[in-house]
Structure formats: C-alpha cells, structure tokens
Amino acid sequence: MDTRPIGFLDSGVGGLTVVCELIRQLPHEKIVYIGDSARAPYGPRPKKQIKEYTWELVNFLLTQNVKMIVFACNTATAVAWEEVKAALDIPVLGVVLPGASAAIKSTTKGQVGVIGTPMTVASDIYRKKIQLLAPSVQVRSLACPKFVPIVESNEMCSSIAKKIVYDSLAPLVGKIDTLVLGCTHYPLLRPIIQNVMGPSVKLIDSGAECVRDISVLLNYFDINGNYHQKAVKHRFFTTANPEIFQEIASIWLKQKINVEHVTL
C-alpha cells in the first residue's frame, strides 16, 4: 500500500477531464494537480519553452512527494514526456498512446481523425503511434488552436464556441468514423463536437483512456493506495486565477474543491 498522491500536470484546466475519470474509477487514490493556466495554451509555443514549462510543473509535483506523474496534456506529452520519463525513477504516463490504442479498436472503416493543439498536430505523434500499431489506418490530423482559450475562459456553452467548433471541424465532417480528442481540454466541448461530427462518429477521450493505464501501472509497481480509505483529500493548484479554475473544476468534477495559487 502506498498512500502518496498521484501527480497530474496540464497547461490549464483540461487535465481535469482525466482527474474526473480517475476519481470515478479509483476513488481511493489521492491527487495533486497543477494547471499552468497563466501560460496556457502551450500549443502555439516553441518546443524549448514547452519543455521548460513542463519541467517546472514536474519539479513542483516532485516537491509534493508524488508516486507517479501523469501528463494530462497532449502537447507536453508530445514534446517532453520521453525526456521526463527517462530522467525520473517514478512512473511517468502520457495520454497519447492510450488514445491511439483506443482509436484503433474503435474504427470500423480505418478512417481516424485527430484534433489537437498546433504543437501536438505538428509533432505527428498520434499518426505515428496509430500507424505503428495499425499501418492500414488512415489518419487525418487537424489543429484547433481556438478550442483551449474557449475552455480556459469558461465559455464552453456560448454561441461563439459553437461557431468556432463548427467552422474548425468542417474539414473532417463526413470523412472519418472515429475522432481522437487529442487535447484534454477538448472533452469539455464534447457535446458541441459530437453534434458537429454526427452521431455515427465515435469520439475518443485520450485522457479517460489513460486512467486504465494508470491502474495497470499502480498494480505493476505495487503502489496502490488504501482501498479502505473513504475520505480522500485532493489538492489542486493553478498559476492563474483560482476562482475561475474552481468554477470550471466544480462543474466538471461535480463537487466543490479548494484551489491554491502557486507561482512557478
């Protein structure tokens, strides 16, 4: 038994979609979450800067005595995950491979779409992972740089959000049967995305898929938390306005949480 927390990092609030699924599947595990909303989005930034920011988040989580780090951010996974994984002596998990594997299982026509930040799409990481496992699958990737700002400003239900999603996804409509939400912010726009793509297109939440791998690693390294612990205290940190973060988090997690401000 290992009662240390699992650390989650993201460029902002998007990683809460992963946390929500973890709380549902593994309610006995403690969580420490750091969202770098003050510098979001990461997607348009240079690789060197993304690596620098990611390491700052990692080092912060290490001060919290975490037993595992989850990159709840596709951009950080694409740019820095392998480097961080090689450098640390605790498990480090990204969201890309679980999402890619789920897309392969889902597609019936071999036509998969991937949407993400400009950096995630430019890295081509999803296509590489998907075609490494299933070479015959065709992958269409599309950058959606306007999605993260919508979520970070808590405007997911606005009319402008609907128009932006509709216009952004137009190149993929009617051309795929599976769509990977290659940014953990995007599930917060899921109802609009599903409406635009149509009911026949299966949406893959890379973050939710990641939780299954977290469970496997906890078992493999024998670092599961206390199954009998009912009242688990989580900690949430943001580099931006705690009130905005708390508002979004409370809606998504369906519970009121305390959010602490941190300067990196």
Swiss-Prot record:
Biological processes annotated in GO: cell wall organization; peptidoglycan biosynthetic process; regulation of cell shape
SUPFAM superfamilies: Aspartate/glutamate racemase (SSF53681)
Signal peptide feature range: none
Keywords: Cell shape, Cell wall biogenesis/degradation, Isomerase, Peptidoglycan synthesis
EC number: 5.1.1.3
Gene3D superfamilies hit by this protein: 3.40.50.1860
Active site per the UniProt annotation: C73, C183
Enzyme class: isomerase
Pathway: Cell wall biogenesis; peptidoglycan biosynthesis
Reactions catalysed, as given in the entry: L-glutamate = D-glutamate
GO molecular function, one term: glutamate racemase activity
Database matches in InterPro entries: Asp/Glu/hydantoin_racemase (IPR015942), Asp/Glu_race (IPR001920), Asp/Glu_racemase_AS_2 (IPR033134), Glu_race (IPR004391)
Binding residues annotated for substrate, in chain numbering: D10, S11, Y42, G43, N74, T75, T184, H185
Function: Provides the (R)-glutamate required for cell wall biosynthesis.
Entry's family note: Belongs to the aspartate/glutamate racemases family.
Name listed for the protein in its UniProt record: Glutamate racemase
Species per Swiss-Prot/TrEMBL record: Streptococcus pyogenes serotype M3 (strain ATCC BAA-595 / MGAS315)
Lineage of producing organism: Bacteria, Bacillati, Bacillota, Bacilli, Lactobacillales
